[in-house]
């Protein structure tokens, strides 16, 4: 077993299943803009790179390039539907509690206000030592700036840091910072792309972390 001091979790698709609420808000936004709604898989493949990238890709081919309006409408709608169907993935709470003697953090491209509201409603917010969202710093994943910020904050060397995520972007971020990476296969990210990114570990359930790290 490998000793880890700092756990860095992605949010959407890793700790929390937010897909239905995100997809529904995307489609309500498109309909409000008099555009055609999209199928779930089209939306799914664009989650993970932040709201601006999400809406940019969802407008592609629509003939509309008003990204700013789309982002604003999405944020407004999603803010009212954060918890309609959103839920923790199996063993999400349990694994964070299992490693409560370590530093447990979140590094996501999702706006931090959304993350905190969801976790607060789930009574899960106090379990995390730090949370960085997509608007916390001037760079987002796969830029390693957020990860390096957390490493410096907790004075933690790369070999004691684990980056956990469902997307190749998370693995890429971890590799840029030289930390250990762990992909999760159950999330929103494309599994083939995740495998191709060659994380150090690949798990099917968060509970698998118990047998790999201490």
List each language-model region with its residue ranges.
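Metal-dependent phosphoesterase signature
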Residues: 56-97
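Helix-loop "lid/cap" segments that line or gate small-molecule binding pockets
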Residues: 29-30, 50-64, 118, 150-151
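Short, acidic loop-to-helix structural element flanking the phosphoryl-transfer center
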Residues: 4, 80-106, 112-116, 144
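Asp-based, Mg2+/Mn2+-dependent phosphohydrolase catalytic module
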Residues: 1-5, 116-214
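Active-site neighborhood of HAD-like aspartate-dependent phosphohydrolases
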Residues: 1-45
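Short helix-capping segments at alpha-helix termini
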Residues: 31-36, 62-66, 123-127, 155-156
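An amphipathic alpha-helix signature
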Residues: 23, 27, 40, 44, ...
């Amino acid at each position: 077993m490998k000793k880890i001091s700092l756990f860095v979790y992605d949010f959407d698709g890793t700790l929390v299943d937010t897909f239905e609420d995100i997809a529904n808000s995307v489609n309500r936004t498109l309909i409000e803009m008099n555009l055609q709604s999209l199928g779930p898989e089209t939306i799914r493949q664009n989650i993970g790179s932040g709201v601006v990238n999400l809406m940019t890709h969802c407008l592609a081919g629509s003939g509309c390039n008003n990204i700013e309006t789309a982002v604003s409408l999405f944020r407004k709608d999603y803010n009212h539907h954060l918890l309609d169907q959103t839920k923790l993935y199996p063993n999400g709470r349990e694994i964070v509690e299992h490693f409560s003697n370590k530093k447990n953090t979140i590094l996501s491209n999702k706006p931090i206000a959304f993350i905190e509201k969801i976790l607060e409603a789930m009574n899960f917010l106090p379990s995390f030592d730090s949370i960085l969202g997509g608007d916390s710093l001037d760079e987002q994943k796969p830029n390693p700036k957020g990860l390096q910020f957390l490493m410096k904050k907790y004075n933690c060397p790369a070999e004691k840091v684990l980056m956990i995520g469902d997307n190749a972007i998370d693995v890429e971020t971890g590799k840029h910072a030289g930390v250990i990476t762990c992909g999760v296969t159950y999330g929103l990210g494309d599994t083939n792309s995740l495998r191709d990114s060659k994380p150090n570990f690949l798990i099917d359930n968060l509970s698998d972390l118990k047998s790999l790290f201490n």
